[in-house]
C-alpha cells in the first residue's frame, strides 16, 4: 500500500489515495500506521476519495481509530495532494467531509501547493448542537468544577466539538492531565477537544490543544478556529488574528457579514512510501 505523509502546522497525517488503493478497515489501519514506534507515526489517517457532490471527499481517523468529522490542517493537505498529483488544475475546489462541504482556495508556488485557505463555515454555539449537556442555551465563559480544579470554558463546534480555556501561560500547563480529564467529562457526550489559549494582543494568541482520540498535537485547525470565535465572543481578539501553535502559525478570520470562519496555513509534504 502506497502512502503519503504530510503535515499542516506540524499536525501530521498519513494520506491514502483511494483512487488507487482499496482500504477495508481504516479504523484498524489508523491505529497501526499512527504508532510512532511500530508504525509510520502520525496523528491519524486520512483517506482521499472521489465524491458524487464535490470535487473530492475525505475521511479521517484519529490515532486511536475513531473517525473524526473534520480536521482543518488535514484538509489543507488534501488540497495540496489532489493538485500536486494532477487530479485537478483548479485553484478553487470543494471537499466533502462529515462536517459538511468545505471550500478551499489553493496557492501554488512553482506549480506546487504551499498554502491553502479554507472556508470552515459558521461556528456552532448552541450547547445541544455541539453537543454539551448544559442547562443554558450556550456555554460561554462559564466556570465548571472538575475533580482537581475549576476551569472557565467556552464551547464552540467547527464541525467537531471544542472547549476553549483562556490561561496566562500555555507553556506552564500540564496539558495531558487537564485535557484528558476534560475530554472525558460526562457533560461532553461525544467527548471534546480542549484548546488552551494565551492572549498576546488583540491580533495574536498562542495555543496548545488536546485532541480527543489523539492527545496533544502540534496543531489543530478547527481548534484554532474555535479559539478565534471564543476569543471574539469574550472580547479578547480581533475578528482577524494569528494563532501560534506548537507546529506553526495559522491566519484566522471570522467574517462579520457571512459569519464564516476562514483559515489560512501551510500544507507540506514529509515523505512518500509503501507499508
Swiss-Prot record:
- Organism of origin is Azobacteroides pseudotrichonymphae genomovar. CFP2
Q: Which protein are we looking at?
A: Diaminopimelate epimerase
Assigned protein family: Belongs to the diaminopimelate epimerase family.
Residues where substrate binds:
11, 62, 72-73, 160, 193, 211-212, 221-222
Q: List site positions: Could be important to modulate the pK values of the two catalytic cysteine residues.
A: 162, 211
Give start-end of the signal peptide.
none
Q: Which domain of life is it from?
A: Bacteria
- Give the GO cellular component terms, alphabetically: cytosol
Query: Does the keyword Lipoprotein feature in the UniProt annotation?
Result: no
Which PANTHER family does the annotation name?
DIAMINOPIMELATE EPIMERASE (PTHR31689:SF0), DIAMINOPIMELATE EPIMERASE, CHLOROPLASTIC (PTHR31689)
Q: In which pathway does it act?
A: Amino-acid biosynthesis; L-lysine biosynthesis via DAP pathway; DL-2,6-diaminopimelate from LL-2,6-diaminopimelate: step 1/1
* Protein's job: Catalyzes the stereoinversion of LL-2,6-diaminopimelate (L,L-DAP) to meso-diaminopimelate (meso-DAP), a precursor of L-lysine and an essential component of the bacterial peptidoglycan.
Catalytic reaction equation(s): (2S,6S)-2,6-diaminopimelate = meso-2,6-diaminopimelate
Amino acid at each position: 500500500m502506497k502512502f503519503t505523509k504530510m503535515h499542516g502546522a506540524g499536525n501530521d497525517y498519513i494520506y491514502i489515495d483511494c483512487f488507487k488503493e482499496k482500504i477495508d478497515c481504516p479504523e484498524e489501519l489508523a491505529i497501526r500506521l499512527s504508532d510512532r514506534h511500530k508504525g509510520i507515526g502520525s496523528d491519524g489517517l486520512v483517506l482521499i476519495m472521489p465524491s458524487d457532490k464535490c470535487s473530492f471527499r475525505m475521511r479521517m481517523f484519529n490515532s486511536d481509530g475513531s473517525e473524526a468529522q473534520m480536521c482543518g490542517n488535514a484538509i489543507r493537505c488534501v488540497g495540496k495532494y489532489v493538485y500536486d498529483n494532477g487530479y485537478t488544475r483548479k485553484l478553487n475546489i470543494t471537499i466533502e467531509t462529515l462536517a459538511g462541504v468545505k471550500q478551499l482556495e489553493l496557492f501554488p508556488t512553482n506549480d506546487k501547493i504551499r498554502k491553502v485557505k479554507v472556508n470552515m463555515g459558521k461556528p456552532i454555539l448552541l450547547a445541544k448542537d455541539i453537543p454539551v449537556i448544559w442547562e443554558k442555551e450556550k456555554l460561554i465563559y462559564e466556570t465548571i468544577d472538575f475533580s482537581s480544579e475549576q476551569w472557565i470554558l467556552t464551547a464552540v463546534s467547527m464541525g467537531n466539538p471544542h472547549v476553549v480555556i483562556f490561561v496566562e501561560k500555555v507553556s506552564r500547563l500540564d496539558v495531558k492531565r487537564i485535557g484528558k480529564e476534560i475530554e472525558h467529562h460526562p457533560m461532553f457526550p461525544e467527548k471534546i477537544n480542549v484548546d488552551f489559549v494565551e492572549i498576546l494582543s488583540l491580533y495574536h494568541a498562542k495555543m496548545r490543544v488536546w485532541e480527543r482520540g489523539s492527545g496533544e498535537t502540534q496543531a489543530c485547525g478547527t481548534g484554532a478556529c474555535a479559539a478565534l470565535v471564543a476569543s471574539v465572543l469574550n472580547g479578547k481578539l480581533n475578528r482577524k488574528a494569528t494563532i501560534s501553535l506548537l507546529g506553526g502559525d495559522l491566519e484566522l478570520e471570522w467574517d462579520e457579514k457571512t459569519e464564516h470562519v476562514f483559515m489560512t496555513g501551510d500544507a507540506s509534504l514529509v515523505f512518500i512510501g509503501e507499508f
